[in-house]
Amino acid sequence: MNKKKTPNNIEDLLSLFSETLTPADVLSAKLMAQFSNAITSERLNLNMSQKDFAKHINATQSLISRWECGDYNFSINKIAEIAAKLDLNVDFKINKCH
């Protein structure tokens, strides 16, 4: 009996598709997941519902939902705009992979 392993994190999930994803696809997915998680964490730290959080930063609840579930391709400008509204620092580190 061959039991399939359920992915526990983004790396496990991405490894399932490693033959069809480029390294850029993998990196992009990881970065979007990190930013989505940061937005969700900040909302939860503020003890706000998605609806209240949307009002707080002048967005819609459906947009907050898309941000949090990773169904949004953030531009650098959008990341900067969200971070400024939430008084968050964004730090990109660029290093050699190997």
Predicted regions span which residues?
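Short amphipathic helical patch at the helix-1/turn junction of helix-turn-helix
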Residues: 33, 43-45
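The alpha-helix within a helix-turn-helix
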Residues: 43, 54, 83
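Short alpha-helical DNA-recognition segment
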Residues: 47-65
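DNA major-groove recognition helix of helix-turn-helix/homeodomain DNA-binding modules
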Residues: 77-93
